[in-house]
A protein has these predicted regions:
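Solvent-exposed loop/turn segments at secondary-structure junctions
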Residues: 106-107, 160-161, 394, 425-429
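Solvent-exposed, polar/charged alpha-helical surfaces in well-ordered, non-transmembrane soluble domains
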Residues: 45, 94-97, 129, 148-151, ...
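Periplasmic OmpA-like peptidoglycan-binding domain that tethers envelope proteins to the cell wall
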Residues: 211, 216, 414, 422-449
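Periplasmic OmpA/Pal-like peptidoglycan-binding modules at the C-termini of bacterial envelope proteins
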Residues: 265, 273-275, 395, 414-417, ...
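Bacterial Sec-dependent N-terminal signal peptides
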Residues: 1-22
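Short, histidine-centered active-site or binding-site loop motifs used for metal coordination
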Residues: 103, 156, 387-388, 423-426
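Short, conserved micro-motifs composed of acidic
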Residues: 21-294, 321, 339, 363-364, ...
Length: 449
């Protein structure tokens, strides 16, 4: 029964139809792989740790493996979680503060297997709580994975209303903490067959999952789908021979580098072990970096629980992400490498804050935000970091819209506030030309506000 949390792999010779890709599978080291079964390995956002499900005769549990900068294993230990929770099929939110996993046959549950959530607070994990009838049903729910924002959850379920036996569903958490009624992921993902084991890369737009049926290589195969700009999933593509075989494949997850994958495979001694391999170029996701933010009061330096909006300057309309800082004023979130981002922080009683993060190739970035209380805002100079104009013109670029909208909201919320808008150009062109352009840009911003 416990193995139904995940999936069962079997030994069948490699499928011979189609041209095989050159894929080399490398077993993860001893200490991770054991005489028991290891499944569903998933890297954390920094790429230096992996949480996976361990199955023994006695129990199902979670372990965490840690790696150095070169990818060598340093240690393996039980996940810091009460051992009485005999569960697996897990996902951690990108900031590492929310854990959703599967428990089966629990008193007070809604179906055979339900999804439960625990939170990391004050240095420890809270007791898991059933995610409720909003998410769980009288059917089977399992194999969850958090989306990019930590507020979206994909999972597999056999609930009524799907397109086949097991489908992939999506639920979203509101600002009040309530999860929405799950929506079917749609016909681009789900079919009359069984879909499961979803994994959405940290880029938020690349979904990997498994599906059975006669059109694949055999058993369960791995598929990939991309999210279009219309927020619809494109028709999923079989990842092909070399990755898929006549046996079952599932449990794939991607390293933040976008090119390294981990998968569960059935070994010759009939055990499930974890293997990694390099994804073929066409299946790779964009490489990522971790952004660690801390928000403080500029005067007291105490943490501020601000709401942050983070967006790609070049594609603000499709990449916007909103998150709340925790009680320590901290947020951790993934960004695409080599992309420029705008950051806007808002908190009650404070002036809105903006920052611009030029693209770079670092694995980890840090940002400290010091917010100015409204009570002491008079005379303060606020630099709007994400207002952009076309070269030699007062025409605003689209990436300026989020910041200007926030300024408008601040003014509407504080009707007695008066501001002076001052613009500065670069040093290209004559002084007279630049002065004229600065005045034009000031008027343009004033008109938008």
């Amino acid at each position: 029964m416990l193995r139904l949390i995940l999936f069962c792999l079997s030994i069948i010779p490699l499928c011979a139809k189609g041209q095989a890709q050159t894929v080399v599978f490398k077993a993860l080291p001893e200490g991770i792989n054991t005489l028991g079964d290891e499944e569903l390995g998933r890297w954390n956002m920094d790429g230096k740790s992996m949480v996976y499900t361990s199955l023994t005769k006695e129990k199902v549990g979670l372990n965490i493996a840690r790696f150095d900068d070169a990818g060598r294993m340093i240690s393996v230990e039980a996940f810091p979680f009460d051992a009485i929770y005999n569960g697996g099929g897990h996902t951690l939110s990108p900031d590492g503060k929310n854990l959703v996993f599967t428990l089966c046959g629990r008193k007070g549950g809604f179906g055979d297997c339900d999804l439960y959530m625990a939170e990391f607070k004050e240095g420890r994990w809270t007791a898991p709580i059933n995610m409720g009838v909003e998410v769980n049903s009288a059917s089977w729910e399992s194999q969850p994975v958090f989306g990019l924002d930590g507020q979206t959850l994909f999972f597999a379920s056999t609930r009524p209303g799907g397109l086949g036996g097991s489908d992939i569903w999506v639920t979203r958490r509101s600002l009040t903490g309530h999860w929405s009624t799950p929506a079917n992921a749609g016909a681009g993902i789900n079919t009359v067959n069984n879909e499961g084991s979803p994994y959405i890369h940290f880029d938020g737009r690349t979904l990997y999952f498994m599906r059975d049926g006669k059109t694949g290589m055999g058993g369960y195969d791995l598929y990939i789908s991309q999210l279009g700009i219309d927020d619809q999933w494109r028709t999923a593509e079989n990842m092909g021979n070399g990755i898929n075989s006549a046996a079952d494949e599932g449990g794939l997850a991607i390293h933040p580098d976008g090119k390294t994958a981990v998968i569960t495979r059935f070994t010759t001694d009939r055990q499930n072990d974890l293997f990694q391999f390099q994804l073929p170029e066409k299946f790779r996701a964009a490489p990522l970096q971790a952004l660690n933010v801390v928000v403080k009061d500029k005067q007291t330096l105490k943490p501020v629980r601000a709401r942050l909006e983070i967006y790609q300057v070049e594609a603000f309309d499709t990449t916007r992400l909103s998150q709340w800082a925790d009680d320590q004023g901290k947020i951790a979130t993934p960004l695409l490498k080599n992309k420029s981002y705008g950051v806007i922080a808002e908190a009650e009683g404070y002036l809105a804050y903006s920052a611009n993060l030029p693209g770079d190739n670092a694995a980890v970035r840090s940002l400290e935000i010091k917010m100015i209380p409204l009570a002491s805002a008079k005379g303060q100079v606020i630099v709007m970091q994400n207002v952009f104009f076309e070269t030699g013109s007062a025409a605003l670029l689209p990436g300026s819209i989020p910041e200007l909208k926030k300024l408008v909201l601040t003014l509407k919320s504080n009707p007695n506030m008066k501001i002076e808008i001052t613009g500065h150009t670069d040093n290209v062109g004559t002084d007279d030309t630049n002065m004229t352009l600065s005045r034009s840009e000031e008027r343009r911003v004033g008109k938008e506000c």
